[in-house]
Each structure stands twice: as C-alpha cells, then as structure tokens.
Design a protein with these regions (language model features):
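Terminal low-complexity tails and localization/encapsulation signals of metabolic enzymes
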Residues: 1-38, 72-76, 108, 123-154, ...
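Conserved C-terminal structural/oligomerization subdomain of aldehyde/semialdehyde dehydrogenase
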Residues: 33-36, 227, 318, 368-370, ...
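Glycine-rich loop-to-alpha-helix module at the N-terminal edge of alpha/beta enzyme cores
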Residues: 35-125
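ALDH superfamily catalytic-core signature
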Residues: 229, 237-386, 408-411, 416
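Rossmann-like NAD(P) dinucleotide-binding subdomain of oxidoreductase/dehydrogenase enzymes
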Residues: 126-273
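Residue-level signal for inorganic ion chemistry
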Residues: 32, 70, 92, 114, ...
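Short acidic active-site motifs
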Residues: 45, 216-217, 412
Length: 446
C-alpha cells in the first residue's frame, strides 16, 4: 500500500481531497526531508464528516449489530496489525523520529488493545436484569449498554497510532462511529490504519478521517451539537479550550493532558540501578512522552554521585536515524518544537540552573549525520528549584531538572514532588519498601 499521491481525507465512505485543495507537507524529523503532502481539511470538510457520521449512526445497523460481529472485526484488525507490523513501524518511525524498536513496541501494544477490547466488549453482550427489594416482581428492570453515538478522537503527535487505538478500539467495539483527527505533524500511521480498517471489513461509514490542524477545524468538531463525545490527548491549554467548548452542548468529554513528573530517589538506592532508571525515564523518545520522569528529586547525600552518573550516561546516548538499529534515541519532532526546548534551556540558565551536559544541538562537525535533522542533545540542568519555569512547565523534551532534598527529609521530597499543576505520573526509588510506599501514597498526581 502506498500513501504518496493519494487523498488523505476519508469522508462519507470516500477518500477525497480538501474542499479548497489545500495541502501541507509532513517531514521526516531525522533529516527534515518532505515525506509526502497530506490534504488539509477545511471547516466545511469537518461539517460534512459530522453529518456523514451522524447519518450513518442513525440509519445503519452498525450500532445494532451483535457484539460478536463487531468484536470479530476487532480481532481481524489485530491480525492485520501484526501482518503489517514492519511497514507500520517504519511509517511511524519516519514520521515521528522515534526508534524502530519503540515503534514496533507500539504496534504490539495496539494489537493487544484490539484483542483486549474484542474480549471485554463481549461481556456487555447481554443486558443485566436488576433485582432487589425496590423492584417489584411485576417490573422488569434492565441495565442496558448503548453506544454514545458520534465520537471525535483527537490524537497527539508523539504516539499517533498508540493513542488512536486506545480510543478507537473501545469506541468501535461498542457500536459508536468515529471522526478521527490526528495531529497534523504526524498523521501518516493514522492514514495507513484507516486503509487497513476498511480492508478488514469495518463499514466505511463507521469512520471519518480528517487530516488538518486543530486551529482550522477543532472548534467545528468540539462545538457541534451532532457530536456526542470528544476524546482528546494533548496540551493543557488546548484541553482547557476543548472542555469549555464541550460544556456548551453538554457533550461527553475525556482528556489526557500534560505532565511534569517527579522521580524521587532516596540515598539507599543502588547507584547503578538508579542511574539507569533516571536516564531511561527522562530521555526515552527524546523526552517527548507525557509520563517521562523530567524532575529528579534526589536525597542530598546521593545527589552528586547520581547526577554525575546520569550526566556520563546521557553523554553516551547514541542519537541517529530511528531506522538505524544502533540509534538509542532520535530527533525532536519538528523545528518548532526544538526551538521551544532551546528557549526553555536559555530561560533555565537565566533563572540560575547549571547545564551539566547538553543544552545545545549536536556539533555538526562531530556529528555531520545529525546536522539536517531536529536533534537536541540530552540535557541535565542542576541546581534547580521549584520556582523555575523549567521545573514547573512541561518542556516535553530531553531535559532533566535536578532538585535536592535534605537527608531523611521525606516531607520535603513529597512537597517538592507535589508542587506542580500537572502531576500525571511519578516515581519513588528506595530499597526500603515501607518508605517507598509511604512516599508514593502521599503523591498527589491529578
């Protein structure tokens, strides 16, 4: 299957171009080369997709099909994902910049997602009768599971196929219809996936695909009274806007937003293990993960040894083409995102942080193969405190901030960890299981 040169909008059962002919390039982050051009949906395209989705949900038998029929399609999709794993992983890597190994893990994950929901949805196949003292024998009271209707799925650029399938599989298993809006930065695996869905037998009306920026069609999708649910993964500000928009029509809304995640390390940890854990937790996928351990909060007596070890390991991380098996991590996703990371590093220095390693692009003389791509060296910022913006705000890149707490002062460690508007995830490392358990139960991760 080739995507180059084919329309990338799927509306009302047909692949089509944008109504105004608009297109945008998508780039390979490794060398900034253009992979292909995708159609840029307009507001009118979005309205047409909503109307088509609503009409299909109302007039087709999709939502009334048996769970067995729909779950069979999910299992077929899982089979197809494994059959096409190599090509899907390659597409995900050239579009996002992540390593091929990471992309292959993502494909295995989404395969399991489809199989999981194919099994779980069958448990909803039979209505459950409610009995009890408040239900007379003459009354039949049932718990009935019904689809929501038209679901808009808006996905991020860092894990495009993974995040989509987490939303897509349960929505389709339960008889909903979906309108998919991938990030305009990394839409390719989503386009490929929709082709696969049609090939395995999903009804063409059960899915609409809009490739476009959120700015151009987002409000149309979230404000429409004909949309019943919006599921969004992405940034905090956009999430707030979507929640407000959905509130106007009182539609269902689920969001997963930013993270600024603490990684507390106590001095009793094995040093080598802690170095490996801290390094991996922050620099995987060049830090472009909402759950990365971007804030190291370390006990004072261990701090210098741990930070020195992380710096040494970070400087040995092999950066390169995600398709190269030797690469441990790839580039940032775009030139714009790299500029954001550079601005955070500059600001951190102005606020008093000390760069222990990284903080710049790779030297083009020493690393000529990285010169064209959106690379940025793994960066460790020492001497940070909780008032700094680089500590409080989500940089979403290869930046580790280091905060220290006095020996034995667990309360300060927890206070530092909880001093964030983000939360989302967190870690506690200690050989003392009781102390670790006591600490993580006090973490407030909204």
């Amino acid at each position: 299957m080739t995507l180059v040169g084919t329309p990338t909008l799927f509306i009302d059962g047909e692949w089509c171009a944008s109504s105004d002919g608009g297109r945008r390039p998508t780039y390979n982050p490794y060398d900034a080369s253009v992979i292909m051009h995708v159609d840029e949906a307009t507001a009118n395209d979005a309205r047409r997709a909503i109307a088509a989705a609503k009409a299909f949900f109302s007039s087709s038998d999709w939502s009334r099909r048996s769970y067995q029929d729909r779950c069979e399609l999910l299992n077929r999709m899982a089979d197809s994902l494994q059959k096409n794993k190599a090509e899907l992983a390659r597409i995900e890597t050239i579009d996002t910049g992540k390593t091929l190994g990471e992309s292959e893990i993502d494909i295995d994950d989404v395969t399991n997602v489809f199989r999981f929901y194919a099994k779980e949805a069958l448990k909803l196949a039979e209505d459950k009768r409610v009995t009890g003292p408040l239900v007379p024998e003459s009354v039949k009271s049932l718990v009935v599971h019904e689809p929501v209707g038209v679901c808009v799925l808006i996905t991020p650029w860092n894990y495009p196929i993974l995040q989509l399938c987490w939303k897509l599989a349960p929505a389709l298993a339960t008889g909903n219809v979906v309108i998919v809006k991938p990030s305009e930065v990394t839409p390719l695996s989503t386009i490929y996936l929709v082709h696969m869905m049609l090939e395995v037998g999903f009804p063409s009306g059960s899915i609409q695909l809009l490739t476009a920026s959120g700015a151009s069609i987002g409000s149309v999708l979230t404000e429409s009274p004909d949309v019943d649910l919006v599921s969004f993964t992405g940034g905090l500000q956009t999430g707030r806007s979507i929640i407000r928009s959905c509130a106007e029509t009182v539609k269902r809304c689920t969001v997963e937003l930013g993270g600024k995640n603490p990684n507390i390390v106590f001095a009793d940890c094995d040093l080598d293990w802690a170095i490996d854990n801290v390094t991996t937790a922050v620099f995987v996928h060049s830090g472009q993960v909402c759950s990365v351990g971007a804030r190291l909060i370390v006990e004072e007596s261990m701090a210098d040894k741990l930070v020195n070890g992380v710096v040494e390991r970070a400087q040995r991380i092999v950066m390169g083409n995600g398709l190269d098996a030797a690469s441990e991590t790839g580039p940032l996703v775009s030139a714009e995102h790299r500029a954001k990371i550079e601005a955070y590093v500059k600001l951190a220095q102005e606020e008093g942080a000390v760069i222990r390693c990284g903080g710049v692009r790779p030297d083009p003389v020493e690393f000529p193969h990285l010169a064209q791509g959106y690379f940025f060296l793994p960066t460790v910022l020492d001497k940070c405190d909780r008032t700094m913006r680089v500590v409080q705000e989500e940089s979403f890149g290869p930046i580790l901030t280091v905060e220290r707490f006095p020996d034995g002062d667990e309360e300060t460690a927890i206070m530092l960890a909880n001093d964030t508007k983000y939360g989302l995830a967190g870690g506690v490392q200690s050989k003392d299981q009781a102390r670790a358990a006591g600490s993580y139960t006090h973490l407030t991760l909204p």
